[in-house]
Curated annotation (Swiss-Prot):
<dbReference type="Pfam" id="PF05894">
    <property type="entry name" value="Podovirus_Gp16"/>
</dbReference>
<keyword id="KW-0231">Viral genome packaging</keyword>
<dbReference type="GO" id="GO:0016887">
    <property type="term" value="F:ATP hydrolysis activity"/>
</dbReference>
<feature type="region of interest" description="ATPase">
    <location>
        <begin position="1"/>
        <end position="196"/>
    </location>
</feature>
<dbReference type="GO" id="GO:0005524">
    <property type="term" value="F:ATP binding"/>
</dbReference>
<keyword id="KW-0378">Hydrolase</keyword>
<dbReference type="InterPro" id="IPR027417">
    <property type="entry name" value="P-loop_NTPase"/>
</dbReference>
<comment type="function">
    <text>ATPase required for the genome encapsidation reaction. Part of the active packaging motor via the binding to the packaging RNA (pRNA), itself fixed to the head-tail connector at the unique portal vertex of the prohead. Binds and supercoils the pre-formed, unit-length DNA bound to gp3 to produce an initiation complex for DNA packaging. Provides the energy to actively pump the viral DNA into the prohead. Approximately one molecule of ATP is used in the packaging of 2 bp of viral DNA.</text>
</comment>
<keyword id="KW-1188">Viral release from host cell</keyword>
<keyword id="KW-0426">Late protein</keyword>
<comment type="subunit">
    <text>Homopentamer. Interacts with the packaging RNA (pRNA). Part of a DNA-gp3-gp16 complex.</text>
</comment>
<feature type="binding site">
    <location>
        <begin position="13"/>
        <end position="20"/>
    </location>
    <ligand>
        <name>ATP</name>
    </ligand>
</feature>
<protein>
    <recommendedName>
        <fullName>DNA packaging protein</fullName>
        <ecNumber>3.6.4.-</ecNumber>
    </recommendedName>
</protein>
<feature type="region of interest" description="DNA-binding">
    <location>
        <begin position="222"/>
        <end position="321"/>
    </location>
</feature>
<keyword id="KW-0547">Nucleotide-binding</keyword>
<comment type="similarity">
    <text>Belongs to the phi29likevirus gp16 family.</text>
</comment>
<dbReference type="InterPro" id="IPR008784">
    <property type="entry name" value="Podovirus_Gp16"/>
</dbReference>
Length: 321
């Protein structure tokens, strides 16, 4: 993953596969060899209560070095090595300087059950922290770690990322998504008593099989060859296309759209640009009313998980029910 040299990296893998351990080991080696420092990030301050145990599982790999945690500072051989920072307090870091930090590790960047635990404007918060730490330096990288909960999260939605979950590496211009293969690890874990206990359960799908248990394939379908483009919608900066297949009586909400169309609807004032039409009440706009009707009648399809998540959020905002 590191060989791709992307500034922002996401690693989503089965629980216990060793994501956190590997990303703990890397900055330790960089500090010992090059004097580079690191920052360990969790979402909220209470999640750092046990940070004093950070080195407990890895210290034995470096028997000639002394590891200590002082408050929220990491030390190796008596020298400051890194910091533990809650993302929720990112604004307090804006005036701090970290000229020797080359690695930011954000652990558990995806919430395991719902979106209620994300901090307001969380992606902007992380980007602000990266900006504060790296400044204009080109040698920094942020690595975000998570269990396989959902391929859809505020970060992928923000950047419009739709990774192929069957590929280990999905490389973009400045971003890399790694979804490690955990088959060998899963086979061994299934032999344990706990592995046998969770095998076949939803928890087992996430922990053993690296399946995205919070994602649903309901209403996800690639648009048909007979579908025709009708109009575009802009929501939270993302432009989406709406297509119709009159033979199947289906509408499709997709990432594909016709950039030359004059039928472009903005659902918020923030998205409104010249040449667009602002829709404040879906019942008063023919196209949007038809889209909402298709959704309510089960006749709307989404071409991927990203479109499904954004679509459901969009309809909720319009109070479609």
């Amino acid at each position: 993953m590191l060989s791709y040299d992307r500034i922002l990296n996401f690693v989503i893998g089965a629980r216990g596969i060793g994501k956190s351990y590997a990303m703990k080991k890397h900055p330790i080696k960089r500090f010992i060899k090059h004097g580079e420092q690191f920052i360990y990030v969790r979402r909220y301050k209470p999640e750092l209560k046990k940070i004093g145990n950070y080195f407990n599982d890895i210290a034995q790999e470096f028997p000639n070095h002394e590891f200590k945690v002082k408050g929220r500072q990491f030390c190796i051989d008596g020298k400051l090595t890194g910091w533990a920072i809650p993302l929720s307090a990112w604004q307090s870091e804006k005036s701090n300087a970290y000229p020797m930090v080359t690695t930011i590790i954000f652990d558990e960047f995806i919430r395991e059950r719902d979106n209620s635990g994300y901090i307001p404007n969380e992606v902007d918060a992380l980007l602000n922290l990266m900006d504060t730490v790296f400044r204009t330096r080109e040698n920094g990288r942020c690595i975000c770690l998570s269990n396989a909960v959902s391929i859809i999260n505020p970060y992928f939605v923000y950047f419009g990322l739709v990774p192929d979950i069957n590929k280990r590496f999905n490389a973009y211009k400045h971003i890399l998504i790694e979804i490690p293969d955990s088959k060998d690890f899963s086979d061994e874990r299934r032999k344990t008593k706990f592995g046998q206990l969770i095998d076949g359960t939803e928890y087992g799908e996430m922990s053993l099989d690296n399946e995205f248990v919070n994602d649903s394939d309901v209403f996800i379908e690639k648009r048909s060859k007979n579908s025709k483009f009708v109009f575009s919608i802009v929501y939270k900066g993302m432009r989406m296309g709406v297509w119709v297949d009159t033979q199947q009586m289906l509408l499709y909400l997709t990432t594909d759209h016709d950039p030359s169309t004059k039928n472009v609807y903005a659902l918020t004032a923030d998205d409104l640009e010249e040449g667009m039409i602002l829709v404040s009440n879906y019942k008063k706009n023919y196209h949007i009313r038809k889209l909402c009707s298709a959704f309510m009648n089960g006749q709307l399809r989404f071409d991927n998980q990203l479109m499904r998540t954004i679509g459901y959020e969009m309809f909720k905002k319009m109070r479609v029910q």
